[in-house]
Swiss-Prot record:
Single GO molecular function: oxygen binding
Keyword set, alphabetical order: Cytoplasm, Heme, Iron, Metal-binding, Nitration, Nitrogen fixation, Nodulation, Nucleus, Oxygen transport, Phosphoprotein, Transport
Native source organism of the sequence: Vigna unguiculata
Limits of the Globin domain: 3-145
Binding-site residues for heme b, renumbered to this chain: S46, K65, H93, K96
Domain of life: Eukaryota
Function: Leghemoglobin that reversibly binds oxygen O(2) through a pentacoordinated heme iron. In root nodules, facilitates the diffusion of oxygen to the bacteroids while preventing the bacterial nitrogenase from being inactivated by buffering dioxygen, nitric oxide and carbon monoxide, and promoting the formation of reactive oxygen species (ROS, e.g. H(2)O(2)). This role is essential for symbiotic nitrogen fixation (SNF).
PTM annotation (Phosphoserine): residues: S46
Record protein name field: Leghemoglobin-2
Assembly, per entry: Monomer.
Gene3D superfamilies: Globins
Length: 145
């Protein structure tokens, strides 16, 4: 069980709303960061076959889904102290053989993207809340393998 406060959930929700304010822009930041850190990750995402394209609805849709899952993770943590991931989500990550290092790259890209999205509203407290929500989501996905 993880203690996650209403305030932490609110911080994560606010960051998600900032991301949603310009999904195409922040999707590009997110996937560009992933590919800078781990170029081979391109092979994990079929929609990156032609590069990072903000007009690609699969790219923006996947980013929105991931960021939404982190927001949902925060809500689950506040409500119950744990996160449960859908078995299908675990299966996809298992099938693609996503490893711990790749989860870390995604977390770093998520944090960088949200930091840019919220601008001067970024704080250590927000960063901690986002990282905790993501880490618990990642653990739940791995558990669902």
């Amino acid at each position: 069980m993880v203690a996650f406060s209403d305030k932490q959930e609110g911080l994560v929700n606010g960051a998600y709303e900032a991301f949603k304010a310009d999904i195409p822009k922040y999707s590009v930041v997110f996937y560009t960061t992933i590919l800078e850190k781990a170029p081979a990750a391109k092979n994990l995402f079929s929609f990156l076959a032609n590069g990072v394209d903000a007009t690609n609805p699969k790219l923006t849709g996947h980013a929105e889904k991931l960021f939404g899952l982190v927001r949902d993770s925060a809500a689950q943590l506040r409500a119950s102290g744990g996160v449960v991931a859908d078995a299908a989500l675990g299966a996809v990550h298992s099938q693609k053989a996503v490893n711990d290092a790749q989860f870390v790259v995604v977390k770093e890209a998520l944090v960088k993207t949200l930091k840019e999205a919220v601008g001067d509203k970024w704080s250590d407290e927000l960063g901690t809340a986002v990282e905790l929500a993501y880490d618990e989501l990642a653990a739940a996905i791995k558990k669902a393998y």
